[in-house]
Amino acid sequence: MTPSVPRASGAPPGGYRGSGNRSGPAYQPAFGAADRLGPPSRPESPRLRLTAAVWLAVWELARMLPESLVFGVADLGGRLAHRVSVRARARVARNLARVLPAATDAELSRAVRGAFRSYARYWVEAFRAADLDPADLDARTTTDGFAHLDAALEGGRGVVVLLAHHGSWDVAGRWAETHGYHLAVVVEVLRPRRLFERFVRLREAFGVEVVPLRRRGASGSEVGGPLGGGLQRVAAANHMIGLLADRDMSRTGVEVSLFGESAPLPRGPVVLSQRTGAPIVPITMLQRPGRRWHLQVLPAVDVDGLAPQAAVARVARALEQLVLLDPVQWHCFSPVWTADRPPRQRRSHAAPAPT
């Protein structure tokens, strides 16, 4: 049974403002995204089906075993993956070298190893997110910067939450829903489909609305396209829309400077903000020692009236600030910068906007 999202009234837990309008009808989330997708366009291979079965088995073990054991095994797995995954290790090193240009070789090596350990922890936390007791989650979480988010919501036009593959974003969604902040997230439809659908149901189980995005490699994959109506409905109800913005998966992004080097970034946050009037607010859930977290909200990004190039460049500055909160927690296991992408994935862009 999926939760409902009532009209905001009074103070949510902890005195946070919460999202939603103070008057008018209750918002009805569009849960059941996995059921509306329909079957995959082509049958999945036996290898993909086996991959799904293995991941789902690991998922169940992560939920069933004692917390200390699960996190200990995950940390060991992250260390092992760092040792044996030569290609991934090199890719993470290239990415983090841009973020930490002054790091020595030894410092960069430690950061890369830490990135693998952080990523392993992310997966365990995602698997266990729906089982987190709200009171326990609250006790383990500190927050900062919520004045930025609450001020943005006072405008009544929703908020575009600027996310990166950083920290533990599924735990952030769980925390948000237990404190009166309703979140809809745009996620790309991935294979194996069975595993993707499990993640959709996980997020919906604790109240996060999932908006699936099919990769098309054209303007149809942008949030300003076919998805726009559903997302605008969320914004009109003064709720939050989460968009991962540190990777251009559609190949229709805008080339801007990111940590001093050219990289394509998605235009979705800018398109949605300019169409709805919803401010862009960067947020991350930082992992802390002892299985604790810190939820950090950064100042809103003003893109009102800016051309796409300048607007996405401004978003890039916000992403830099977010990543620099703890570069080790940036799960940058894919090519980000243009120089690292295969030629077939590159396209002609305008010159990077000035910072």
What are these regions (language model features)?
Residues 2-7, 14-17, 22-27, 31, ...:
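Non-catalytic C-terminal accessory region of glycerolipid acyltransferases
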Residues 57, 91, 147, 171, ...:
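Short Gly/charged-rich anion-binding patches and loops
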Residues 155-218, 248-254, 258, 287:
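Catalytic core of membrane glycerolipid acyltransferases/transacylases, capturing the structured
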Residues 139-142, 165-166, 192, 217-225, ...:
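A conditional alpha-helix N-cap/helix-loop micro-motif detector
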Residues 3-7, 12-163, 196-201, 207, ...:
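Membrane-anchoring hydrophobic helices of lipid-metabolizing enzymes
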Residues 73, 108-109, 187, 214, ...:
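Short loop/turn and capping residues at structural boundaries
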Residues 54, 88, 168, 195, ...:
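Residue-level preference for nonpolar/small residues embedded in alpha-helices
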